[in-house]
Amino acid sequence: MSAVGPDGKKDNLAGITHVIWPEAAMPFLPLEHPDALAAIGAMLPDGSVLVTGALRREKTAGGERRGFNSLMAFGGKGQLIATYDKAHLVPFGEYLPFNTVLGAIGLEKLTKGLGSFATGPMSRPLLTIPGLPPVAGLICYEVLFPGSVIDRKLKPGAIINVTNDGWFGDTTGPRQHFHQTRVRAVEEGLPIIRAANNGISAVI
């Protein structure tokens, strides 16, 4: 992240309230590196919030570590404000289908080696981020599924979608993914703020 505007002037960052980074923007576990978060927070414009895709992990009661693909919001001092854990994981990319069955028949090493992310709550809780209406978070291809991207009973005011489209390569994939996002915005009647890594970023 640059501490100056595109024309090289630092004061051009004045008035920026939210900085949004895509999925896979941080190559480390931010909650385990408070010094890095503090340094990033110091670069943010005063009073602004960083919203970013990031990974986190936690220990279960049994001592097992579980990893999550998450959307996080951080304040100006690097403090965590809000977290959403991806609920709709990518088969074989983020989890191994039937992993409990494979584990039960003695293939634990296979199940642990492929797709290590845990599933976030399907209730899709809203994020409370200063300066924004209640936000529904969507990570990557979660935005593709009509009728299931938000809980309408919770009445979000906007959707933030972070994605890493780098694995599509030089194909039509990033454009198709973006057009599907536009359709979701129309279906839900909500603005979508989209930050993409090697894809199309936009406010829809």
Residue ranges and their predicted role:
Residues 1-204:
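Enzyme catalytic cores with a strong preference for nitrogen-chemistry domains
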